[in-house]
Amino acid sequence: MPWIQIKLNATNENAELIGDMLMEETGALSVTFLDAHDTPVFEPLPGETRLWGDTDVLALYDAEADTQLIMSQIKASNMLAEGFAYKIEQLEDKDWEREWMDNFHPMKFGQRLWICPSWRDIPDPTAVNVMLDPGLAFGTGTHPTTALCLEWLESLDLSGKTVIDFGCGSGILAIAAIKLGAEKVIGIDIDPQALLASKDNAQRNGVADQLDVYLPQDQPEGLLADVVVANILAAPLRELSSIIKGLVKPNGQLAMSGVLDTQAEDVANYYRDELHIDPIVEQSEWCRISGRKQG
């Protein structure tokens, strides 16, 4: 069935309160916060909510909702300034999951690595193929940060090496490392759902016995790897820099992404004391920082 969407322009100070009011008083089925100006916002730390200065609040209702009544309730709440901007539109019903699946195609990284949705045919059976079902965790290869890390891994000789995927998400980087020759790979993530998705995808690729996954508090003491990849975000890359550097063996290699071009030099400076940093690689405003740890 079709849906009705009401979009309200708010600020980061009142967006959450407005969202609560829409759910509790107007019967909204869901509420979403979007940036009104496409300004990057960074992943909040646990327990923290971080929104844009100019935020659109999108509320979804069923097609029978009384929009005049809803708008009168919104105005009566006095949460928005007089003359606030809003938009009401009807959305056609779609099979969103099917549409997403139809638009997720096999992708090639470097000379020999393919990331293939599990429901698609493999384009090149002789290549290094990672079959992926993202499930509940982020990481399909479509985002520039994932692509930058995959291309970096593909460029290395991983034969017989140990790799840590710090912030493993769906396990795409960890599984790619195994397929590219790594002997052992460890995935670390703060989200238990990510660990489940990583193990499920590893099983799908026949490499589950080469992948161990841990929550940070459960990882073995003294964990070290020849290669570490951390596709997270700038804030945790800064805050966890000592931990991440400590995972890299002497003469080992590290790559990081989830960093915008405006943040790259600052993040890199947190690692220069222990690593020789390579030239920063940029793709669509996102960057990869890589380097080798001093011996």
Swiss-Prot record:
<keyword id="KW-0489">Methyltransferase</keyword>
<feature type="binding site">
    <location>
        <position position="231"/>
    </location>
    <ligand>
        <name>S-adenosyl-L-methionine</name>
    </ligand>
</feature>
<dbReference type="GO" id="GO:0005829">
    <property type="term" value="C:cytosol"/>
</dbReference>
<keyword id="KW-0949">S-adenosyl-L-methionine</keyword>
<feature type="binding site">
    <location>
        <position position="189"/>
    </location>
    <ligand>
        <name>S-adenosyl-L-methionine</name>
    </ligand>
</feature>
<dbReference type="Pfam" id="PF06325">
    <property type="entry name" value="PrmA"/>
</dbReference>
<keyword id="KW-0963">Cytoplasm</keyword>
<dbReference type="InterPro" id="IPR029063">
    <property type="entry name" value="SAM-dependent_MTases_sf"/>
</dbReference>
<dbReference type="GO" id="GO:0032259">
    <property type="term" value="P:methylation"/>
</dbReference>
<protein>
    <recommendedName>
        <fullName>Ribosomal protein L11 methyltransferase</fullName>
        <ecNumber>2.1.1.-</ecNumber>
    </recommendedName>
</protein>
<feature type="binding site">
    <location>
        <position position="167"/>
    </location>
    <ligand>
        <name>S-adenosyl-L-methionine</name>
    </ligand>
</feature>
<comment type="function">
    <text>Methylates ribosomal protein L11.</text>
</comment>
<dbReference type="InterPro" id="IPR004498">
    <property type="entry name" value="Ribosomal_PrmA_MeTrfase"/>
</dbReference>
<dbReference type="GO" id="GO:0016279">
    <property type="term" value="F:protein-lysine N-methyltransferase activity"/>
</dbReference>
<feature type="binding site">
    <location>
        <position position="146"/>
    </location>
    <ligand>
        <name>S-adenosyl-L-methionine</name>
    </ligand>
</feature>
<comment type="similarity">
    <text>Belongs to the methyltransferase superfamily. PrmA family.</text>
</comment>
<keyword id="KW-0808">Transferase</keyword>
<dbReference type="InterPro" id="IPR050078">
    <property type="entry name" value="Ribosomal_L11_MeTrfase_PrmA"/>
</dbReference>
